[in-house]
């Protein structure tokens, strides 16, 4: 049986937030997603970084860059999920700033 859990965490209250999704089957992580987004002064949400498995492997969508490149994470999924959580906590301000610079101005 697959168990799913979704939760959010404020990185900078109330503007910047992270949303996490984790899907576990028989004790193994089978799917995961992390999204970093912020709300602008008009109430519009902007996603500036995302990790998911939409192309088969867990990878990072660098939405804060002009070309919106992808970084592949080759660690086992549970470990990669924790690495991505740490990356977002440590770098969200830089990612948000890059998104604003490259996409809103």
Q: Where are each of the predicted segments found?
A:
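Negatively charged, low-complexity tracts enriched in Asp/Glu with abundant Ser/Thr
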Residues: 1-39
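Mixed-charge, Lys/Arg-enriched low-complexity segments
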Residues: 54-105
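A short, structured beta-strand/loop element
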Residues: 28-69
């Amino acid at each position: 049986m697959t168990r799913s859990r979704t939760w959010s965490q404020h990185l900078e209250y109330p503007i910047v937030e992270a949303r996490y999704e984790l899907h576990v089957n028989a004790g193994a992580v089978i799917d995961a997603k992390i999204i970093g987004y912020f709300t602008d002064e008009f109430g519009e949400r902007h996603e500036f970084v995302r990790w998911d498995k939409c192309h088969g492997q867990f990878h990072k969508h660098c939405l804060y860059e002009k070309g919106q490149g992808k970084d592949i994470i080759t660690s086992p999924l549970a470990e990669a999920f924790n690495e991505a959580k740490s990356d977002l906590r440590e770098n969200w301000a830089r990612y948000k700033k890059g998104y604003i610079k490259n996409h809103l101005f």
